Amino acid sequence: MAAGAAEAAEAAVAVVEVGSARQFEELLRLKTKSLLVVHFWAPWAPQCVQMNDVMAELAKEHPHVSFVKLEAEAVPEVSEKYEISSVPTFLFFKNSQKVDRLDGAHAPELTKKVQRHVSSGSFPPSTNEHVKEDLNLRLKKLTHAAPCMLFMKGTPQEPRCGFSKQMVEILHKHNIQFSSFDIFSDEEVRQGLKTYSNWPTYPQLYVSGELIGGLDIIKELEASEELDTICPKAPKLEERLKVLTNKASVMLFMKGNKQEAKCGFSKQILEILNSTGVEYETFDILEDEEVRQGLKTFSNWPTYPQLYVRGDLVGGLDIVKELKDNGELLPILKGEN
C-alpha cells in the first residue's frame, strides 16, 4: 500500500499540471534547455486519463524531459493559440518553440516521439569530424527505417506545407505504404539530409534507403506510371484483417494486452480465456485506429473485445460467457466444433 502511494506521488511530481496561460508561458520560458511535452486533455475523456498514465511512465523513464498536462477547456486561450480542436493532443517544445504534435491516444507513437526528440537533442560534445560521422550514420539509419521513407514538413495527418501535402496525397492515392519523418522536429536532420543526399528541398522520398526525389520527380513517375513499380504497396485493409484474424488459432482483439487490460470487458474475457488453459494471442485495438474501425465492418460486430477462432468470429464477452456456462467454450477454442 505504501509502495503504491509512493509511486503515485512520484508520478504526480514527474508530471506538472498547468492551470493558467501565464503559468504555461512561464514554464515555456524556464524550460528552454529541455524537451517539454504538453498533454492537452479533458477529465471527462477516458482516453485522456489513460494517456496521463502513459505520460507518467514516460516521465519516470526520461527524468530530463518536462511533462505537463493542461486541461484544454480550462485554459482556452492556450488551446486556441495552438489550434487544439480535440483531446488528447500532445505538443512538443524545444527552446520555447513548438517542434512536433501528436493528435489522439496513440501510446506507442507518443513513446517513439519522446525517444526521438530526446536522442536528437543529446549528442555528446565531440570534434566536428566525429559529429559529422555520427550524423551520417544516423541519416543512413533514418533513410532505411522503412522500405519507403518520406521526409516532410509536418506529418501525414497534418502536413505543414503544400508540397508535403501533395506528396502525401499522391502516396495515399496509389495505396503506397510509407513511414514519415517530420523535419521540423529535428533541425540537424533537416540540414544534414540536404548534404547527405545532395538534394536541397523537401519533401524527399526514399525507397530502400535510396533517394527517389522530391514532389516534381514523384509527379513525373506518377504520370509515366512508374511510381507503382518503384514504391511498396500497402496491403488492402480487408486483406490485412484476414491475416490478423488468422494470426493464431485463437485471436482476441481487445483494449490493452494480456498483461494489462484497458477496459473491464477486456479484463473479464482475459480471465475466462486464461481459465481454459488454451493458448491465444491478442491485438491491442487502441494502437491501430484503422484496425479498430475496420474490424467492426469486416465482422459486422460493433463492439470490443472480439474473439476469433481460426479466423472466424466467435463473438464478444456476452457470447463467450454463454458458451462457458453451456460448456461449449473449450471445444470451440480447440476447434472441435
From Swiss-Prot:
Q: What induces it?
A: In neonatal cardiomyocytes after exposure to the hypertrophic agonists EDN1 (ET-1) or phenylephrine (PE). In transverse aortic constriction (TAC) induced cardiac hypertrophy in adult hearts.
Q: Which domain of life is it from?
A: Eukaryota
Q: Name the residues that bind [2Fe-2S] cluster.
A: 161, 263
Any one GO molecular-function label of the UniProt entry: iron-sulfur cluster binding
Give the record's GO CC terms. cell cortex; cytosol; dendrite; iron-sulfur cluster assembly complex; nucleus; Z disc
Localization, UniProt = Cytoplasm, Cytosol; Cytoplasm, Cell cortex; Cytoplasm, Myofibril, Sarcomere, Z line
**Sites of Phosphoserine modification:** 119, 122
Q: Which SUPFAM superfamilies match?
A: Thioredoxin-like (SSF52833)
Database matches in Pfam families = Glutaredoxin, Thioredoxin
Every copy of the Thioredoxin domain together lies at 2-119
InterPro entries the record matches? Glutaredoxin, GRX_PICOT-like, Monothiol_GRX-rel, Thioredoxin-like_sf, Thioredoxin_domain
Q: Which residues form the Glutaredoxin domain?
A: 144-238, 239-337
Locate the N-acetylalanine modifications and list their residues. Answer: 2
Which GO biological-process labels does this protein carry? [2Fe-2S] cluster assembly; cell redox homeostasis; intracellular iron ion homeostasis; iron-sulfur cluster assembly; negative regulation of cardiac muscle hypertrophy; regulation of the force of heart contraction
Which controlled-vocabulary keywords does the entry list? Acetylation, Cytoplasm, Iron, Iron-sulfur, Metal-binding, Phosphoprotein, Repeat
Record text about domains: The thioredoxin domain lacks the two redox-active cysteines. This strongly suggests that it lacks thioredoxin activity.
Assembly mode: Homodimer; the homodimer is independent of 2Fe-2S clusters. Heterotrimer; forms a heterotrimeric complex composed by two BOLA2 molecules and one GLRX3 molecule; linked by [2Fe-2S] clusters. Interacts (via N-terminus) with PRKCQ/PKC-theta. Interacts (via C-terminus) with CSRP3. Interacts with CSRP2.
Family matches, as NCBIfam families: Grx4 family monothiol glutaredoxin
Q: What does this protein do?
A: Together with BOLA2, acts as a cytosolic iron-sulfur (Fe-S) cluster assembly factor that facilitates [2Fe-2S] cluster insertion into a subset of cytosolic proteins. Acts as a critical negative regulator of cardiac hypertrophy and a positive inotropic regulator. Required for hemoglobin maturation. Does not possess any thyoredoxin activity since it lacks the conserved motif that is essential for catalytic activity.
Q: Which PANTHER family did the record assign?
A: GLUTAREDOXIN FAMILY MEMBER, GLUTAREDOXIN-3
Descriptive protein name: Glutaredoxin-3
State the species of origin: Rattus norvegicus (Rat)
Organism classification:
Eukaryota, Metazoa, Chordata, Craniata, Vertebrata
